[in-house]
């Protein structure tokens, strides 16, 4: 995954395009599927069972070697990873604070509120949220962000604009990583 490689390079202070050993890559991205579908479908098509204990062990190892650790979800809070596990189960297994990423598009208000409620019910701390502009044509973005602030009870820790630059995925990932670093430092201060 080009984004994972770019983020791995940025996290290590190396230039984009740096080659890594397969073991290094697998430690930060143990599951990578080609099909852009729900994780449980992609895993089944690849003949792989997502193992939450493996992810927990890799996360513990990475946390021991680094100042902070970010675990990116896929598909949403309740997205199934298998017939028996979901992203919510993974978050509970890791027992880390949760940063909600709100995909800014039509329907995001309802989706964000329901997700925030589910996270809080899980017992995990919801430390904040960021806005990720998915739909560059969405009208009334400012009004939706203001309503999200009111409904979620806090201002966004970051607002990530839609990438209109036409930059390659690696450059976009590095730019996002720089912005994300600021957000993570804010979250670390909230703990």
For each feature predicted by the language model, list its residue ranges.
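N-terminal phosphate/diphosphate-binding loop that engages ATP/GTP or pyrophosphate donors
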Residues: 1-49, 53, 58-61
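Switch II (G3) loop of P-loop NTPases
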Residues: 55-83
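Structural motif
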Residues: 70-72, 99-101, 130
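Short glycine/serine/threonine-rich phosphate/pyrophosphate-binding segments
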Residues: 77-82, 107-113
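Charged helix-capping and loop-helix junction motifs
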Residues: 82-89, 113-116, 141-146
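Inter-motif core of Ras-like GTPase G domains
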Residues: 82-105
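C-terminal lobe/tail of nucleotide-utilizing enzymes
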Residues: 117-191
């Amino acid at each position: 995954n080009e984004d994972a490689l770019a983020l791995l390079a940025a996290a290590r202070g190396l230039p984009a395009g740096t080659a890594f050993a397969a073991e290094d890559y697998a430690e930060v991205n143990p599951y990578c599927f080609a099909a852009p579908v729900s994780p449980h479908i992609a895993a089944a098509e690849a003949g792989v069972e997502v193992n939450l204990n493996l992810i927990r062990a890799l996360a513990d190892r990475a946390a021991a070697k680094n100042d902070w650790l970010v675990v990116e979800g896929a598909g949403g809070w309740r997205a199934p990873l298998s017939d028996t596990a979901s992203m919510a189960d993974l978050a509970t297994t890791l027992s880390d604070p949760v940063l909600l990423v709100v995909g800014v598009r039509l329907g995001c208000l309802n989706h964000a509120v329901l997700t925030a409620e589910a996270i809080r019910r899980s017992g995990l701390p919801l430390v904040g949220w960021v806005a990720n502009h998915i739909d560059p044509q969405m009208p009334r973005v400012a009004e939706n962000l203001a309503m999200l602030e009111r409904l979620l009870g806090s201002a966004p820790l970051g607002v990530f604009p839609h990438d209109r630059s036409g930059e390659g995925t690696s450059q976009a990932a590095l730019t996002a990583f720089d912005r994300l670093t600021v957000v993570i430092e804010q979250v670390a201060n909230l703990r």
